[in-house]
Amino acid sequence: FEALSRGAERAWFWDRSAACITTIRDNARHLNAGDRVIAQRIDATKPPTAPRPVDLVFLDPPYEQGFIPTTLDALTRHGWVRDLTLVVAETKRREQLVLNTDWISLDRRDIGDTGLSFLRPSMAGAA
């Protein structure tokens, strides 16, 4: 929602939980952003084909289950990522994020018990 408040054209929200999707849709209506929000009950490791690549991806999967590399690969394969896409991946503070050579880590910030990794596709892996 922050991205929408700062001028993003559209935001996709995916979650495996129906309750979370309902909450997202309710919040979108409350913020008068319903026409710019697409909230879908989807496993992010199995995304649909993108209508076009996006500029920003925020990943907040369950911690310490290895979902981030799998999700990054899936998003790339399905056209969500391009060479300038910025990915912010949330992990547990002490969780080590292991990426393949298709991704470069730009920065990492620790906030409390949370780690935020800022990633971009490498030129070799860019779609």
Give the positions of each predicted feature.
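Class I S-adenosyl-L-methionine-dependent methyltransferase catalytic core
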Residues: 1-127
